[in-house]
């Protein structure tokens, strides 16, 4: 069975333009009534990674939330907003990102995810005891509202990756530790979360996205697109098409195809891919490559074969958010110095993800630098 993805242009975040684009985008895939029924409790799951102002392009823009709340109510649904930020409380992140102002204006509740449970019918396909927030499981409908961004470990954060926020606070660190240095293992966790949550509708905020070393330290880039789909995986595949990269360049897509979840045939409605392709976009620094070497050799050559996080001393404000979040505790403060234990580091780049100053950089190993001279690492 084919799935559908709509592509609609939207020039900026003017509220009137956004609601028009949202209506058109969702109408193309069946209309809001297809996804929301009268009386349904509807969870709106934005990307609320960190408390940054909307122009930084770190979080889903408030106008997307406001327009979606309006459409859900028109269909008779009862919306509420929920997430579990990487740093700080939901209230703080929502205040700085402008989402709390929208929630207050629209009288839409904000719910922080802090009730982890293993679903009754089990956790994920691969990770059997994966815990999801109970609030997510109790919602009648989940509308996924990701931001189009790069991601240092996972290459891009789109529909599937955004659902990682359905895992409450400290449980996220446990997931990184379960996956260790294996980015594909982490992608399997993300696909497991997708299987459990099964969002009814995904709306991607690509009006202004993020390029470079995201998801927190990249640069805003106008893309001027809004994408909608009943299938997050299909939406993620179409974004790869728009960027001119192989669909399986995105590890979550690759894992989904391995598990027979991905769809080869997708109906694209509204704008045609060839007419709205992104001509210039900077991907994140390559974090690792599967060289096909025996395990013992890969471990011995770890620093050469992978990228590693490094501190930019002149920018660092010594807030120590990075040391607090590091899952394997491979990052410590010794006096004024930030010290990485690269033997313990699992290359999850959580430190880069939460640094408020952009003071964590990505340093490729010599083998990766050599490879990048001969091959574009973004196209596989």
Roles of regions detected by a PLM:
Residues 1-313, 317, 323-337, 342, ...:
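N-terminal and secondary-structure boundary signal
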Residues 346-347:
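Extended, alpha-helix-rich binding/interface surfaces that flank or overlap catalytic cores
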Residues 376:
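Helix-rich C-terminal "cap"/substrate-channel and partner-interaction subdomain
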């Amino acid at each position: 069975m084919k799935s559908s993805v709509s592509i609609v242009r939207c020039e900026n975040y003017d509220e009137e333009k956004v609601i028009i684009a949202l209506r058109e985008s969702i109408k193309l895939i069946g209309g809001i009534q297809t996804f929301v029924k009268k009386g349904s409790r509807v969870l709106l799951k934005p990307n609320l990674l960190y408390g940054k102002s909307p122009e930084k392009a770190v979080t889903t823009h408030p106008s997307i939330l406001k327009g979606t709340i309006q459409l859900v109510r028109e269909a008779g649904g009862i919306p509420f907003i929920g997430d579990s930020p990487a740093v700080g409380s939901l209230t703080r992140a929502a205040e700085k990102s402008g989402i709390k102002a929208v929630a207050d204006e629209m009288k839409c509740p904000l719910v922080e995810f802090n009730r982890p449970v293993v679903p009754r019918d089990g956790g994920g396909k691969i990770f059997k005891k994966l815990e999801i927030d109970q609030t997510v499981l109790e919602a009648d409908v989940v509308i996924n509202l990701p931001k189009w961004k790069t991601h240092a470990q996972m290459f891009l954060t789109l529909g599937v990756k955004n659902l990682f926020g359905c895992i409450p606070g400290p449980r996220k660190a446990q997931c990184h530790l379960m996956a260790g240095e294996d980015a594909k293992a982490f992608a399997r966790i993300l696909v497991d979360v997708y299987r459990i949550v099964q969002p009814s509708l995904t709306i991607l905020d690509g009006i202004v996205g993020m390029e470079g070393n995201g998801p927190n330290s990249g640069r805003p880039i106008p893309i001027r697109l809004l994408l909608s789909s009943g299938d997050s995986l299909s939406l993620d595949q179409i974004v790869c098409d728009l960027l001119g990269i192989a669909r399986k360049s995105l590890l979550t897509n690759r894992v989904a195809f391995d598990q027979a979840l991905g769809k080869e045939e997708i109906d694209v409605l509204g704008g045609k891919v060839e007419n709205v392709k992104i001509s210039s976009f900077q991907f994140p620094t390559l974090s690792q490559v599967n060289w096909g070497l025996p395990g013992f050799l890969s471990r011995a050559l770890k620093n050469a074969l992978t990228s590693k996080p490094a501190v930019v001393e002149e920018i660092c404000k010594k807030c120590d958010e990075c040391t607090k979040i590091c899952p394997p505790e491979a990052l410590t403060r010794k006096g004024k110095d930030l010290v990485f234990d690269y033997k313990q580091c699992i290359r999850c780049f959580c430190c880069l993800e939460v640094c408020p100053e952009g003071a964590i950089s990505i340093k490729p190993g010599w083998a990766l630098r050599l490879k990048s001279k001969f091959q574009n690492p973004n196209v596989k």
